[in-house]
Amino acid sequence: MKRCIKRGGRYIVCGDENQAINQFAGASSTAFLDLYNGPKTTQFELPISYRCDKSIIKLAQRFVPGIMTREEVGEGLIRRETLIKDIKPNDMVLCRLNSPLYMCYSRLMDLNIPCYIKGKEGELDELKKLINTYKEDENLGLDWKENGLFPNLYKALIEERNSYIENGYDNIEAINSQSVQYLYDNIQSLIAIGRKCQTVSELKHRLENIFIEIENGVCLSTIHKAKGLEADTVHIICPSLMPMKNTVTPIEEQQEQNLIYVAYTRAKHTLNFVSEGDFNPVKSLNNDIVDTFDYIEDRVCKLFKISYKKPKNTIIQPKKKRGKKINPIIRSTTTNVKTAVDRKNKKSTKNKIMDFLNQ
């Protein structure tokens, strides 16, 4: 960018480090901050939000204390434990992951509420790629009673995880790897769309229309894709997925906090937190990731009559500190100790959200 400026010229950069959320795609989380250190740099603060009402800004201040609202805005409304049926045309629905959005899409279609999923070019092709190798009349196998599309996709998922373990990763690191998580999320998305389908052909047909924008329709989007967008009313589904528990580094933790801030500040007047009662399978993914994969592996092994080498559980006795009782930790032998400790200690952002939701 600097090379585009003539010698002695000046340039203005406007940005918000609290909205740095794309490090996973190669974007530097510190690039904007690095500009502060340049020679003859003048910094101007722009703390006022001209989008959100007061109550929404007050909630966002839990993560970005410096944000302010203009005096003439309304009070705004924040509601907890709302329902999918409360979603109306022109509203926006946000989630940390894709698969709950597909579940919500199916429910809205059942309620005859016009909606679409905001997707990028090629995203539909990625979903189709998973099913294109199967025959049009192939059974989906959602009940696990016979071989079909989804048992085979889950088999591929377990084998993808195992490939990481064979290359030295521990169990949790393998499950949380980008390719395994991406495949799992896509499988869950297909299940949500195909729950009323019988064959691969029917599933393909239903996939064709989900990304076509509908005038006055409900926009369902991941938080990443919603950056820069706004709506009078925003519904957040599966808020327990924010922050994701598979964050390890401080930068990843900060990016998760930034995602929460971005999600809240898409709403102009009303911010709703949808009840998680309809999303229990997704909620359990974040809380019991290892148990979820153990269950999938067990079903795959029984259906295909195969077996994989499972990690054993080991009891680790921590060093006892004077005057303190320390309980033993039971973990997989393939679980990295540092990862387990880091994950256990990262509760601050999560607690901020859950304290609010439990008020």
Predicted regions and their residues:
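Short, surface-exposed amphipathic charged segments that create phosphate/polyanion-binding patches used
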Residues: 58-63, 87, 128-136, 288, ...
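Conserved helicase C-terminal RecA-like lobe
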Residues: 135-274, 278
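Short conserved AdoMet
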Residues: 5-6, 88, 268
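Conserved RecA-like ASCE P-loop NTPase motor core of nucleic-acid helicases/translocases
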Residues: 14, 71-194
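Helicase C-terminal subdomain and adjacent C-terminal extension
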Residues: 251, 259-262, 268-358
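Conserved helicase motor core of SF1/SF2 NTP-dependent helicases
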Residues: 1-81, 92-107, 118-126, 215-218, ...
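Residue-level detector of anion-binding/catalytic polar loops
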Residues: 10, 114, 270
